[in-house]
């Protein structure tokens, strides 16, 4: 009963305070219900998570609602109210990227139409790089070995013909011995076969380094290009599909290079040589059949493969979708478990697999049709040539050895022809895979240095940040900041407060140059941030975000990520300053403990301390704390705030605190309150509380009242527990 009474007072106080805000906010009536526009988009943003240990009644009635401002609502559902408020038409920066995704994808589609010829041309730059003599020598040597292997390979049927013709004697006569010339021909036959294989393997070994270097360079340059793309581009992409596209693209490069050097060029050379030999040895009729066969075979293969290409594209699309679903599910494993949505995601993944299966079945069926057609064309030609050869032997124009030579030459073409079909097929598929990779490289880098960027260094600090009439929106339509102007003083602690979606976190993104403003300027020490060198600007800014991004590596390596070149002594020092030493001492593996993917193996407070250690190591002159303590309990929050004050409140650094919890910023030298993308008010904590109609004052009163009631509830809980124990 004690706790229940406190809870009811908590609900009533929350209700009355919300109604106080309604005096300065709008209320939208929808039917017999009322949608409330509140400065915060959900209940927890009005204070701490007050209902974490208490249950919220599904509905509550209050006559106060009916009397206040003529509102006619008699029964307001808390969940509906929370949902309604969160859907209020405030510029929501958390969801602003959804609209930009469509625009981004449209832009990408227009910008990255790449032909297969263009892909091969771009790839050739890596096979024949300018100024790299070693690679060029390897390529030329590989081509020489290729030609040598094919010349020896064509000689094999001639040696075999001579052996057959040389055997055309009466071996029943005991006086007949194996001629020395025939023995030499047999040896040459064996050497030619072995030489062709040896030259081919040497070619493979020599060209392997060229191919792998090309793959390495393309992959590295693609990765570096992706790292340069703006934040909006990355937020509009699914990581699983992106990594799968890169993986398939690099494999496609490997196949294209091997196909070009090991198959297409050798096959073309061998077909030309065989046609020439047949024309010279046996007349134009044999060469004509051979040439016609090659032509029909190639046309059929190319047209059928072009028809099959769309099935491969469908399979790739389904594969990307499945990979994205799987990766998202694994990354958000906890959320999946919290909401018991394993079956939903399994079904979603299953649907992607079904689409992939159907596409792959079509690929296999069309492959069977292609192989059958190729075999029909080749077998028909071979049968016709054998008939002509047999007719020539019977007529005395050809020897048995000539018939064997024709058969060997044509059969020798069957292997490269079969390869030609599969190579062209795989080449087309690899080019499709490579197209996705090369498309990534064609995306425009929007945030770039100007022609003559200015440097920024510690000697220029402390830094003043100034926004001059800044307007910005993530999708170009809904504006998050609207003609906003304010100054963050140098070397002081400045806080930015306001409702969700008012543009608080956008301030950080614009200063850091994740984005550039549509209108106005962002100045650091009087210089537009667009005039600074991007790398130097970002080195001067340290960020402790609400959800610290950690790598699946050790604590030591995650801290070291703040400044890779830092010494062990420096890393140890910042670990001590961030009060991580006690945690590390308790761990069996100490600082070598793996934190898990995204830091899931350590608590929220420990993650934030690790983030503080990381930015301490970076030693930036401008510090942003973006809701750094909002996800922590009160005790951990206060402990972390003491650590932050101890390390960052000197006059040497400019500190900016973005916060919903106003208690955490009450000691700030300046507080800037944003509302709907504009500056509502600014001043110190005491100055803002002293003002009439102050938004900050209203928010402060609500949070303070809720904090007091939370303390009362906790006290009543403790009292009840003591009573239970005494009983």
Curated annotation (Swiss-Prot):
<keyword id="KW-0067">ATP-binding</keyword>
<feature type="transmembrane region" description="Helical">
    <location>
        <begin position="282"/>
        <end position="302"/>
    </location>
</feature>
<feature type="binding site">
    <location>
        <begin position="371"/>
        <end position="374"/>
    </location>
    <ligand>
        <name>glutathione</name>
    </ligand>
</feature>
<keyword id="KW-0472">Membrane</keyword>
<comment type="subunit">
    <text>Homodimer.</text>
</comment>
<feature type="transmembrane region" description="Helical">
    <location>
        <begin position="184"/>
        <end position="207"/>
    </location>
</feature>
<keyword id="KW-0809">Transit peptide</keyword>
<dbReference type="InterPro" id="IPR017871">
    <property type="entry name" value="ABC_transporter-like_CS"/>
</dbReference>
<comment type="similarity">
    <text>Belongs to the ABC transporter superfamily. ABCB family. Heavy Metal importer (TC 3.A.1.210) subfamily.</text>
</comment>
<feature type="domain" description="ABC transporter">
    <location>
        <begin position="465"/>
        <end position="701"/>
    </location>
</feature>
<dbReference type="GO" id="GO:0005524">
    <property type="term" value="F:ATP binding"/>
</dbReference>
<comment type="function">
    <text>Performs an essential function in the generation of cytoplasmic iron-sulfur proteins by mediating the ATP-dependent export of Fe/S cluster precursors synthesized by NFS1 and other mitochondrial proteins. Hydrolyzes ATP. Binds glutathione and may function by transporting a glutathione-conjugated iron-sulfur compound.</text>
</comment>
<feature type="topological domain" description="Mitochondrial matrix">
    <location>
        <begin position="425"/>
        <end position="727"/>
    </location>
</feature>
<dbReference type="InterPro" id="IPR011527">
    <property type="entry name" value="ABC1_TM_dom"/>
</dbReference>
<feature type="transmembrane region" description="Helical">
    <location>
        <begin position="139"/>
        <end position="160"/>
    </location>
</feature>
<feature type="binding site">
    <location>
        <begin position="308"/>
        <end position="312"/>
    </location>
    <ligand>
        <name>glutathione</name>
    </ligand>
</feature>
<keyword id="KW-0496">Mitochondrion</keyword>
<feature type="binding site">
    <location>
        <begin position="498"/>
        <end position="509"/>
    </location>
    <ligand>
        <name>ATP</name>
    </ligand>
</feature>
<dbReference type="InterPro" id="IPR003439">
    <property type="entry name" value="ABC_transporter-like_ATP-bd"/>
</dbReference>
<feature type="domain" description="ABC transmembrane type-1">
    <location>
        <begin position="139"/>
        <end position="429"/>
    </location>
</feature>
<dbReference type="InterPro" id="IPR003593">
    <property type="entry name" value="AAA+_ATPase"/>
</dbReference>
<dbReference type="Pfam" id="PF00664">
    <property type="entry name" value="ABC_membrane"/>
</dbReference>
<feature type="topological domain" description="Mitochondrial intermembrane">
    <location>
        <position position="281"/>
    </location>
</feature>
<feature type="topological domain" description="Mitochondrial matrix">
    <location>
        <begin position="303"/>
        <end position="368"/>
    </location>
</feature>
<keyword id="KW-0999">Mitochondrion inner membrane</keyword>
<dbReference type="GO" id="GO:0140359">
    <property type="term" value="F:ABC-type transporter activity"/>
</dbReference>
<feature type="binding site">
    <location>
        <position position="421"/>
    </location>
    <ligand>
        <name>glutathione</name>
    </ligand>
</feature>
<dbReference type="GO" id="GO:0006879">
    <property type="term" value="P:intracellular iron ion homeostasis"/>
</dbReference>
<feature type="compositionally biased region" description="Basic and acidic residues">
    <location>
        <begin position="90"/>
        <end position="107"/>
    </location>
</feature>
<feature type="transit peptide" description="Mitochondrion">
    <location>
        <begin position="1"/>
        <end position="25"/>
    </location>
</feature>
<keyword id="KW-1133">Transmembrane helix</keyword>
<feature type="transmembrane region" description="Helical">
    <location>
        <begin position="257"/>
        <end position="280"/>
    </location>
</feature>
<feature type="transmembrane region" description="Helical">
    <location>
        <begin position="369"/>
        <end position="387"/>
    </location>
</feature>
<dbReference type="GO" id="GO:0005743">
    <property type="term" value="C:mitochondrial inner membrane"/>
</dbReference>
<feature type="topological domain" description="Mitochondrial matrix">
    <location>
        <begin position="208"/>
        <end position="256"/>
    </location>
</feature>
<feature type="region of interest" description="Disordered">
    <location>
        <begin position="87"/>
        <end position="107"/>
    </location>
</feature>
<keyword id="KW-0547">Nucleotide-binding</keyword>
<feature type="topological domain" description="Mitochondrial intermembrane">
    <location>
        <begin position="388"/>
        <end position="402"/>
    </location>
</feature>
<dbReference type="InterPro" id="IPR036640">
    <property type="entry name" value="ABC1_TM_sf"/>
</dbReference>
<dbReference type="GO" id="GO:0016226">
    <property type="term" value="P:iron-sulfur cluster assembly"/>
</dbReference>
<feature type="topological domain" description="Mitochondrial intermembrane">
    <location>
        <begin position="161"/>
        <end position="183"/>
    </location>
</feature>
<dbReference type="Pfam" id="PF00005">
    <property type="entry name" value="ABC_tran"/>
</dbReference>
